[in-house]
């Protein structure tokens, strides 16, 4: 169990993109308390063969709108005043379970089945004072060059283009869910280098309106990939994924996509 008090200051100077709830000019302050619970019983941080990894966190800002005597329902309230102190409560969970298909004590290069689920919600105390920051950008390989995504949280979903689920058109989400199943097999499992291939099936979605959150309305994909871990370089990877669904009502299905991995896994 860990607790931390965090402060982030944002300053926008003639920000031309419609990224943050029409917030283009001014400053914003984020003061929040984060509480986090983690449990990790995995046997290897690189190529995990058995164990589980669970985490749950909540971040809370003071509910300024309850006591600052501002009418946030007034559309004439200046944007800079509306977001001078941003407020939210943000909840996130994640869990991974690794199951070896052979006994790791006798078979070093055992295939491993990994199941994962994660999700998050960022909500407001006042519906007229939603946070423009900390929202979710979903789809692709988390290596997008989208404007403003350093102020948002990027969630990968293979088989779909970067930001096609949420964020590509500044339609950032306030909730998301993702579930994955991977079958991994190590080609090389040594201290100097670890290489493994994988097949995956996953599904996820993100919603701008929290009331539309539906864990059964997910965008599905499947594919194959390879990972290489070298101590002096870090984690490298390449995936091919096929998205079976339409990211939204007016686009084509995800289709065939290539994804790159650098530093952190999808």
Model segments located where?
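Transmembrane beta-barrel wall of Gram-negative outer-membrane proteins
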Residues: 1-23
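C-terminal outer-membrane beta-barrel translocator/porin domains of Gram-negative envelope proteins
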Residues: 16-187, 199, 207-209, 260-265
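Short glycine-rich, acidic/polar surface loops and turns
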Residues: 184, 221-227
